[in-house]
Amino acid sequence: MAADIFAKIGDIKGESLDDKHKDEVEVLSYSWDVTNTAHIPSGGGGGAGKATFQDLSIVHKIDKASPKLLEACATGQHLKEATITFRKAGKGQQEFLIVKMNDVIITGVVQSAPGSEAGSETVSLEFAKVDWEFKPQKADGSLDAGIHFKFDIQSNKVG
């Protein structure tokens, strides 16, 4: 399924001209890892460990947001929130995945420009709270109610 992805990172303005996501960053790719140190020994008696939340990363073309993203990273600026929105491309343009983060810090900006291609950068975000919402598609093509994963990383609690 083709998707458009947009990032609203604090008050940093990107180059999106989209009506619903004007001045946001147009995202090329997204990644985020959550792991758990659970251990299941032979004979049973295993237990869950503590979840480890890696930085969420996006890749986008170098654009007018780049200097401000670099500045926020270099200064350790705290951003109130950031939102990554995935939208089905084409007619209807339904937003099916929304990742909202609170108390955000940009922990890395890695720029690259292989060969004669235009440059891109990977921006890494660390955050204190996340609300990850997915809206499944129904048989008629509309979206169902959102299913949430909400987690307070600082207190290590769901919700």
List each model region and its residues.
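Glycine-rich, low-complexity intrinsically disordered segments
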Residues: 1-159
